Amino acid sequence: MVNPLWTYDRKRRKSSAGILGVDEAGRGCLAGPVVAGAILLPTFFFTVPANRKACASVNDSKQLKEDQREKLYDSIIELGEKKQLFWASGEATVEEIESENIVGATCLAMKRAMEEVSVKSNGVWKPQMKTEDGLFDSQKKVDDFWIVSVDGRPMRRLPFEHEGIIKGDTFSLAIAMGSIIAKVTRDQQMKKLSHEFPHYDFSSNKGYGSPKHLRALDSEGPCVHHRPRFLRNILEKTELDQRKDNDQQSQLSFL
């Protein structure tokens, strides 16, 4: 059976030079960077039967097991080496998440991934700055017109022309492949950080707020890779709970 994500993009890539799909990973984490993945699928990509076979199990990265994601990641890299597609990742640091907030940092990571995929493709696709109305220029020639799609709603702070597709990683092959690149790239980074900071169990939770991660934050405090913006509510709640416990202990001492 043909992957419905393949069919979705194959149909909509008509009358265009191809599709660029972009997604992110790590937006809701307590630690580590936010990473974006960009996949450029030239229109000829959909004319090669071997490519369809290679993409048969591509899906939203969140719907895949870790070993499935890693195998598909390797397949995407291999397709890139064969010049069937172009891929890139970009990231925004914890410091940038703090200064730009998570939305701004996500846009920054996406922008970097898009710029890098343009470089890797030797300018086959070039970023187009948004027009005043933010819409695609329908007068462009087919050879120049690329469908640029990001997962979710359009990003106001992303400066390049694009469209947003709600739950796009469940519809679009290019976006789903971008989500795999972003997720595996980020997971690899968090596993490396886990060797340096074993208390937080980054290799398992990848920076999300698992019970073990939260217990380590309570006992060890945050490290340099934690996001201050994301920890404030947690730390404030912990301090409030501690004050309540202390008050209760004080009251009990008078009984």
Protein language model features and the residues they cover:
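RNase H-like, Mg2+-dependent phosphodiesterase core
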Residues: 1-255
